[in-house]
Amino acid sequence: MEGSMNRDFEFKQLLRAYRSGIINDATFETEMKNLEHGASNGNGAGFTAFGKTYATEREAGIKFLEAVAPAETAGGEAIRMWLSTCKLDCITGGLKMVAERESYHGRAFAQRLTELGGTVPSASAELRESIAYLCDANMSDLEKLHTAATKFPNPDETIRPLFEFAEQLKEDQQTKEMIKLFAQDELSTLKWQNSLCAVLIEMKKNGQLAAAA
């Protein structure tokens, strides 16, 4: 019963996107086939991702996009705020690349969510609070980098669930490939920040870095 209600909701989302011109005939037809395929192959067990169980793969994908699209956009905005005050060239260079990545991730995922009939929510207060330190003018650049690095000390383990989720997706090949590339970008960012942080901390210990850095 619950699965049927979820499919009805997903169909209405698709129909709304189609009627409003957000998706074309081909996309609508493809997504309808995916929805029907998910219904015909359902075994009652649901689709499990990130420790939660969803009625369908489609529902899991939409929930993922709803969470990630605003988070990436907010991350890009916060990093640009940091860039406006950053004093270390090595950090500035990396931040420029990361800011662009975050922003285009947000745009691409928002577009995909809209194509699926979803609506992009605003970034939550909890999310904005968790990245507020990036905009804190009272923190040094190294302190900010160190804070970011300590949040994710093991990049491979942090990003592994994203790769696993992408591999689970069988029906939505568009979202699958987007998530795979997103995960590679995120892994690159985490490895960059952790590696650079270690180098700068060592330089500071040896007196090779200004105290204000």
Where are these regions (language model features)?
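Short, Lys/Arg-enriched N-terminal segments with co-localized hydrophobic residues
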Residues: 1-4
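Non-heme di-metal
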Residues: 8-20, 24-213
